[in-house]
Every structure is written in C-alpha cells, then in structure tokens.
Curated annotation (Swiss-Prot):
It comes from the Bacteria. It comes from Tropheryma whipplei (strain Twist) (Whipple's bacillus). Keywords: Ribonucleoprotein, Ribosomal protein. The gene is rpmB. HAMAP family: Ribosomal_bL28. Gene3D superfamilies: Ribosomal protein L28/L24. It holds the Pfam family Ribosomal_L28. This is Large ribosomal subunit protein bL28.
Amino acid sequence: MSSVCQVTGASPGFGYAVSHSHRRTKRRFDPNVRRRTFYVATLGRRVTLNVSVKGLRLIDKRGIDAVVRDLIKKGVKL
C-alpha cells in the first residue's frame, strides 16, 4: 500500500535514527496512512481512499463531499 495520503499529500520523510552513542543511521518517517471507505452522497457510491489521520480530521471538519470535490478537480482517480 502506498504511504502517501490522497487528501493532504503527506509522504514519507527521511532522517537519522540516533543511538545513545550518537551513531546515525538513515531511517524513514512514514505518515500514519490508513485505507478507509466513505459513502459519498453526491456520487451515490462508496469511495476508498488512502488517508492519513490528519486527512481524516480534515474530512471530519470539511465533510467528505467537499474533500472529494477537491480531489476530482485535482484529477485524482477515485
């Protein structure tokens, strides 16, 4: 599964894991992305999205219809 949020565009960041002795090794910081299904009344069907928890809060705030409308304008395939 992709670790990119379809709503916010959050993608993995890269940095270092620093041990107690301060040795640095490369690591990846993944966003908290989940696969969720929403019913969109304006489309009359369910839509499955890869969405981060921040994206879920955005959907709670703005509503799924407004978020899906913006995704369709961006050209995201639903």
